[in-house]
Structures are given as structure tokens and as C-alpha cells.
Amino acid sequence: MIIDPHIHSRYSGDATASPGDIIRKSREIGLDAIAIADHNTLKGSILAMKEAKDLDEFMVIPAMEVTTNKGHIVALGITQEIEKGLSPEDTIDKIRSYGGIAIAPHPFVRYREGLCGYVKDLDIDAIETLNSRYIFGYSNWRAKRLATKRKIPEIGASDAHFLGAIGSCVTELEAEFSVESVIKGILSGKTNVFGNRTPLQLILKEVIKKKIKRS
């Protein structure tokens, strides 16, 4: 199974695509599953799940990207929202109590609210070691080194904020088409991550589009 477990919809506030468009793009490029992990809301994820419920060989995993008081954590597999501003430890406890797993996204990218040094001893379930915005950067290398050292499962994800970036980085794992199976597959540690950097021209194009939209 090939999944992109970190995509943003327009409900994030800093992205542009609708959940429906994200599903269509994801199927077009051959993904088996996605997670829409919007900032501090499940709205985009829940809407996508409803739209995808009757699709064959494709699934949407519920998720959100929670802002803790130390940085971002992706809550994968939850259907109850978690409030922002809690400590990472309390956030992780809530994620697990709701049946999900906690992933550290772009952990060493400070300006995007990564957990940075705080992640080193944190009881996290998986680490995003390949993020399409930083594929050649030091931050991914540090994330990979930490995951290897602590034997934490690795995640690859696009962190897409627009359609053209979806699937830029992905995670490959053995799983059935169920949330429980995907979570089990990640926790097994038997994941492969691969992909390419989101082209800079696409990032700049989207930044310009968002500025025009706000003006």
C-alpha cells in the first residue's frame, strides 16, 4: 500500500484544495490511501472520509495536525478533535486514548513549528523522516538519524498545501484497507519512505496565488 499521510485542505487556513479535489488527485496519481491532516481541525478529514466511503481500493484515514505548546504533532487515526496548546505528552496521551498514533512531522524545522530538540526523548509513535519540502535538507537527515537511533517507525509525506504537491513523498507499507491495519503497519516499523522535493516553482506559484486571494 502507498499512502500520503500528511495533506492539507482548505480547512487548514493555509491551503487551497477541497477534500474532494484532493481525493480525485490522489486517485489519479495512484495512491491507495491518504490522510488529510489539517491544522487543529478534523473537518476536512471527515468530509473526505464521507466522500471516499464508497470508493474501491482507496481510503481516507482520519487525521489532524495538532499545535502543542512545543510544536506540531500529527494525530493519525482519530475521529475526535484534540484542542491545541496542550503539552506534547498530554496530546500524545489523548491521541492514543482516541485510538490513534502520534507522528512528529518535520520535527527539525523550527519555522514550521517542528518539535525540534524536544522530540529527542519524546514517546512518539512515528517520525516524518521525508517531507517533500525539505527532501535535500538537513532537517530530514536529522529526523532520519533520530528514527534510526531510537528505532522509531519512519513516515514519508508530502505535507501538501496544494494539489500539485500531493504524493511528492509517500510511505509504503503492508496493510489492508482499514484504519486499524494501516496503524498496525506503521507501528510494525516495516515502512519504506520515498519521493521527491516539491518543485520550488510550484511552491512560489501557490504563495503568489494565496497573496492575491487575500488582497
Residue ranges of each PLM-predicted region?
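Charged catalytic cores and adjacent phosphate/nucleic-acid-binding surfaces used
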Residues: M1-S9, G13, P19-K25, K43-L47, ...
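N-terminal beta1-alpha1 ligand-phosphate binding loop
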Residues: H8-D14, G30, I36
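Divalent metal-dependent hydrolysis catalytic cores, especially in the metallo-beta-lactamase
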Residues: I23-T41, I101-I103
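Short glycine/serine/threonine/alanine-rich loop segments
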Residues: L31, F58, G100, I152
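Active-site catalytic pocket residues across diverse enzymes, especially alpha/beta-hydrolases
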Residues: A52
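Ordered, amphipathic secondary-structure segments that act as subunit-interaction surfaces
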Residues: G85-L86, P105
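Aromatic-lined carbohydrate-recognition surfaces of secreted/lumenal glycan-active proteins
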Residues: I103-Y111
